[in-house]
């Protein structure tokens, strides 16, 4: 399998599928073509395809492919049909009520970050075979240069994040597809003039030295006798835009629900092939069972515009905003702890006045947005924290200042005549700013806040609070449905490989959209995000329905997004595939 994995990786890298470019479509086309060449998908062409991302101006797609043991979901029903000779109508009804098929989801993304950091070596950054020859001591860290000389690592843009893991998952899906097809061919026999599926064992784990990671006792306890002969369903999902705003994963929730219903699937576990680091011992790999949440609070301050000479009669919005920043930036009291994991405190990413040029007057408005990473805090709790800090700052201000959330401002605007026409034009311009002028979500959020204040002719001092996209819900697999079953998967993974399973992946990930606990769909974020709707959204209710527990678990990689990006050859081609094979059969 080593050759197949490296061949897939080589071809994926050659697509140079930089995020937010049409090159992402080149990768999608190549991946779908790879699957369609497999005999299994020639037999079942309806089990792979491209799912267009709704409303995406670049017309990108999610690539999906499903391998499913026919008859696995109808085992009891098939036996009953043969024994009792039930009618076709009864047979169809039984199929509709069949037990769903245990399903593992291989998930990842096919977009990569740009290669600018490679400097003179950039033209070869996407060439798996030649990039190493164009890297040297000057362009690499000492550790990376040592790895380069060792020959034990593969270099190049995307090999680590995350085309390497994607290549492994594609190769394993192809392997499983071949075995299932062979099983189907052998198990179709004619009895009493009817074709009946006769279940036969399928050995989906190849014996070999890479299988020795679990001793016999562990294997029998965790996987059970004959577990390697079981066969459920394996769904591959690769999305675009993970490196930007996760439009691919957000847009694919309806795909997941649709496939679940169409093919009678039971999503037991998702494995995101995000590259993992190792501890200092070089052996223990860090795996995550959750993903940190991310919010982007936006604060717009409107002061009272006067010439500097009349300072005491005015109000400088920069003074208020700077105090809000000082009260929240790096505030350790806001951080969260989960075991020995600690979240990062609030970090302001943008703070400035909104004057377009220089003059001898105070700025009318100033604004900023702040990066907030959460473990369990909700948008409502984050909003309450910032509003509390804002009101505390305003207690020291002599001028009266109105504090309002975005939803309050918007509801005031809705009461005014001409609002409908105003909002239609606003939404048209909003799309133009995002899609044609390539403004960012925070920039357009601030533009919407200012435009709405102007529509109301609101000229009194005020602070408006809201959120800008993106929003990544904090998630823990242990809070999903079937927590006891997931505990078994954790135990199995720990037996298969030397790992340290942590909870919150510290960088945001698409796994935030695998599910949220039932009853946590609070609308506070939606109603206080000016861009929520046409330009940014995801199906919150679908997350509560799906609830797919997951591991962020990929091959061992280093220096992703840097010129020294690399993936360990042994981890990629031997260790990771072997562990995934066995983990599949723990789930099935």
PLM regions and their residue ranges:
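Acidic/His- and Gly-rich active-site-bordering loop/insert found
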Residues: 1-157, 185, 218, 222
